[in-house]
């Protein structure tokens, strides 16, 4: 284990608990290993003890790694989402400032103010008239700025500044001084970029230590007449983002930091104060940092560029007090995972590392070796002349019990971690669905803003009103310019009060001019009561989107008397944009590649599919439509879709800020593994072997060794058993047919091995892991029986041995001598195989395998 993760283990309660349990078991193994040297059964526990010790260390290592990784991934996700959502928001602001700076009313106002102020300075009647004109113009521009901020509510002030630094206008109640000294003005005047971004102290926002401002030159006929400054509500926006990423019981501290590691915004002013410089955690993948006298697990994530914009070099940052970072999380999400599904997922744990998945298999292998060793020890005690047999048998029983306890600890630790992991994936699916719907709502918020603002455009209103100098050609030019700036739209349309198309932004839609819009959204638009209202279409195909499915947002265009004279409709490029949102929300690897199997679907409020990230999902539309109709609440559950188990998270669109949303629902599918084929993945359960309980109070006792094959228990007299060995040593003989499985080298010779299931005419063995070597009456060479598992070595009273007639016509009766009556009536019989019948069956007489040639090993060829 890496040094850092070793240091973190002490803060992982679940791992500490299992480490203590394993240490306690290891001490018991040490004692048993010592005692085994005193017994006469020949059992050597050294290799078993060392194997369990090695596996225990591997388990602790993997548990620590998985626990650390789970916490790190959760923190990375939140840090990434925090900065990415903000960057998407700021990208819209970079477009806003350039478009607003080109607004005709703003340009004319900024051109006229210096002239009017010069006239006012001269005094006289002309000065008084100019003062009144300036006041009316300022009132009008303030109303226009207020209209803008009413729609784009992410700004707390809009300031127009003359090249000299004099403030020409701002929102009513704005706090900018009469003349600003902000260097942003000179920087903007000298820039030819589409926008200038500043995060620094500014006298235009005196209440903030640093303000985020977007600026652009305002020009009139090629001359710069002002600088437009949009003052962004950074603290307000960050608070909203952080609120959605945390819950009340969350110990993590979320923040944004700049490229100098200084805190820009934070959820906790005491643990992570704004302006403080934090230790660099970039690239440490969940390393420990010390800050303000406390240790934290810290994560820093760079912004992912959106449409080529990466933001102002800020990063998402998450810190969790290290003593709280790995506390057991709520596994209530398991309630949404049906028991059958959870059992299947455990058998096919695709969400675990290969190393962790191997531990249960390794534990099974060690347990099988131990069982075989104990079984052989019991056989030796029964057939030999060992002293102190009672002590040796008691020791073997304790060794067997200790093996089961150790294996149980391994199974429970893996099982509980698996349950936690499934719960974590369920929570992740719900989180990703929330992110997807957040991106969706924020995007459509901007669409509702755009159509309402553009409906106030003077050229568009003049065209509909028939004003001189305004016509369809001029309107189309305006719409085309807007569409070139805002590429999320397929087209933008202007229509009149008769719902007829007047202008469009696309050259290939000119044939639609003059056509009447019959869809209900056009009528809804004309019925809006004020400039804050907007209409939205149902999701579906439209001629304005080349007959592709789309959403259309529209707002009323009003004349001088405030009455509706038409509308502006923005036609969303839904197919492209919705899929991009869903893909961006899904988890990606460190190289930016979408994680395999992760999918997302967007439904409308009626459960119809709007968009899916994977074409295979849309091909199974019936299943998707069923899911869409049956989703009634937000949350997470496990569903089977197309032969796969998925963690299915869902979240409904409730809007963003004042935007109400359209009731859409995002559904995210994160893979949990394939659905196993029934009858293949499940092994036949063995009945309880209660016939094997020793009963020393009875006389005429007979000792047997028991074993399992093809879902049932069998027994042999202990006196004819030599030992059990691993079936891996069996050499297959291609020329030998059933029932022979091959040969095994034992001592100085080769021993033929017969498959018990083939001898008895039973189903194939599912796990042929053991070969029992036995003596046969009248034959020098031993025989090997291929079986599945070993049982106990009981002493059974003769009166519990039932005649073979109880088996009626069962195939096993050909080889069975007795049936041992079970202690528990509900349990199955244990069938005693007769060695004499085996000889007849295999080497003479009639029946399955009679007269077949005994296989011999082939010489190995040396390359």
What are these regions (language model features)?
Residues 138-153, 183, 227-285, 322-350, ...:
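Solvent-exposed, extracytoplasmic
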Residues 224-225, 263, 501, 564-565, ...:
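Glycine-rich acetyl-CoA-binding "A-motif" of GNAT/NAT acetyltransferases
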Residues 666, 673-863:
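An acidic, low-aromatic, low-complexity terminal/linker signal
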């Amino acid at each position: 284990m890496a040094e850092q993760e070793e240091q973190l283990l002490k803060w992982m309660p679940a791992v500490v608990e299992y480490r203590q349990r394993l240490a306690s078991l290891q001490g018991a193994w040490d004692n048993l290993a010592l005692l085994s040297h005193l017994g006469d059964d020949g059992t050597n526990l050294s290799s078993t003890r060392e194997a369990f010790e090695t596996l225990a260390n591997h388990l602790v290592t993997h548990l620590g790694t998985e626990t650390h990784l789970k916490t790190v991934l959760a923190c990375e996700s939140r840090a990434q989402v925090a900065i990415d959502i903000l960057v998407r928001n700021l990208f819209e602001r970079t477009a806003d400032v350039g478009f607003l700076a080109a607004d005709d009313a703003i340009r004319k106002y900024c051109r006229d103010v210096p002239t009017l102020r010069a006239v006012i300075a001269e005094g006289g009647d002309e000065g008084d008239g100019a003062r009144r004109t300036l006041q009316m113009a300022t009132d009008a521009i303030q109303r226009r700025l207020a209209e803008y901020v009413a729609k784009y509510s992410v700004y707390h002030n809009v300031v127009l500044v003359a090249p000299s630094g004099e403030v020409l206008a701002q929102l009513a109640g704005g706090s900018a001084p009469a003349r600003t000294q902000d260097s942003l003005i000179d920087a903007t005047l000298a820039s030819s970029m589409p926008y200038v971004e500043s995060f620094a102290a500014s006298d235009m926002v005196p209440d903030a230590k640093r303000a985020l401002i977007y600026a652009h030159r305002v020009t009139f006929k090629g001359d710069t007449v002002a600088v437009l400054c949009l003052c962004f509500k950074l603290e307000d926006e960050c608070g909203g983002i952080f609120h959605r990423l945390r819950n009340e019981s969350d110990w993590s501290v979320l923040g944004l930091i700049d490229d100098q590691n200084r805190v820009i915004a934070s959820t906790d002013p005491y643990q992570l104060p704004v302006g403080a410089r934090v230790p660099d955690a970039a690239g440490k993948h969940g390393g420990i940092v010390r800050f303000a006298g406390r240790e934290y697990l810290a994560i820093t994530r760079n912004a992912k560029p959106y449409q080529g914009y990466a933001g102002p070099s800020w990063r998402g940052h998450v810190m969790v007090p290290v003593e709280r970072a790995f506390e057991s999380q709520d596994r209530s999400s398991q309630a949404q995972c049906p028991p059958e599904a959870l059992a299947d997922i455990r058998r096919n744990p695709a969400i675990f590392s290969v190393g962790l998945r191997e531990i249960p298999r390794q534990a099974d292998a060690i347990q099988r070796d131990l069982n075989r060793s104990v079984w052989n020890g019991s056989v030796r005690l029964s057939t030999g002349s060992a002293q102190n047999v009672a002590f040796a048998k008691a020791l073997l029983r304790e060794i067997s019990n200790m093996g089961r306890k150790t294996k149980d600890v391994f199974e429970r630790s893996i099982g509980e971690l698996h349950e936690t992991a499934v719960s974590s994936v369920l929570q992740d699916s719900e989180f990703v669905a929330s992110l997807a719907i957040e991106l969706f709502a924020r995007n459509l918020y901007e669409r509702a803003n755009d159509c309402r603002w553009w409906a106030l455009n003077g050229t568009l209103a003049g065209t509909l009103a028939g004003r001189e100098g305004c016509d369809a050609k001029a309107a189309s030019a305006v719409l085309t310019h807007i569409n070139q700036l805002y590429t999320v739209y397929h087209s933008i349309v202007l229509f009149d009060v008769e719902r007829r198309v007047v202008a469009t932004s696309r050259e290939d839609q000119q044939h639609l001019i003059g056509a009447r819009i019959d869809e209900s959204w056009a009528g809804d638009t004309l019925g809006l009561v004020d400039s804050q209202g907007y209409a939205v279409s149902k999701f579906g195909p439209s001629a304005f989107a080349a007959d592709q499915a789309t959403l259309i947002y529209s707002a009323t265009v009003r004349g001088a008397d405030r009455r509706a004279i038409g509308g502006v409709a923005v036609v969303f490029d839904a197919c492209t944009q919705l899929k991009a949102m869903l893909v961006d929300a899904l988890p990606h690897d460190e190289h930016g590649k979408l994680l395999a199997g992760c999918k997302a679907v967007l439904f409308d409020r009626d459960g119809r599919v709007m968009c899916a990230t994977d074409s295979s999902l849309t091909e199974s539309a019936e299943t998707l439509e069923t899911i869409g109709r049956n989703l009634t609440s937000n949350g997470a559950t496990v569903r089977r879709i197309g032969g796969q188990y998925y963690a299915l998270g869902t979240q409904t669109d409730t809007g963003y800020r004042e935007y109400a949303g359209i009731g859409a629902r995002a559904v995210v599918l994160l893979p949990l593994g394939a659905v196993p084929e029934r009858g293949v993945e499940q092994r036949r359960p063995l009945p309880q072997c209660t016939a094997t309980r020793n009963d020393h109070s009875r006389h005429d006792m007979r000792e047997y060794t028991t074993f399992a094959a093809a879902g049932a228990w069998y027994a042999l007299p202990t006196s004819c058993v030599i030992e059990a060995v691993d079936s891996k040593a069996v050499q297959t003989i291609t020329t030998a047919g059933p029932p022979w499985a091959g040969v095994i080298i034992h001592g100085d010779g080769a021993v033929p091995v017969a498959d018990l299931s083939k001898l008895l005419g039973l189903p194939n063995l599912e796990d042929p892991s053991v070969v029992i070597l036995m003596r046969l009456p009248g034959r020098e060479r031993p025989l090997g029986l291929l079986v599945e598992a070993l049982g106990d070595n009981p002493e059974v009273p003769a009166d519990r041995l039932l005649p073979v007639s109880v088996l009626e016509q069962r195939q096993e009766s050909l080889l069975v001598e007795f049936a041992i009556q079970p202690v528990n009536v509900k349990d199955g019989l244990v069938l005693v195989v007769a060695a004499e019948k085996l000889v007849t069956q295999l080497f003479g007489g009639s029946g399955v395998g009679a007269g077949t040639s005994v296989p011999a090993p082939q010489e190995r060829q040396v390359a």
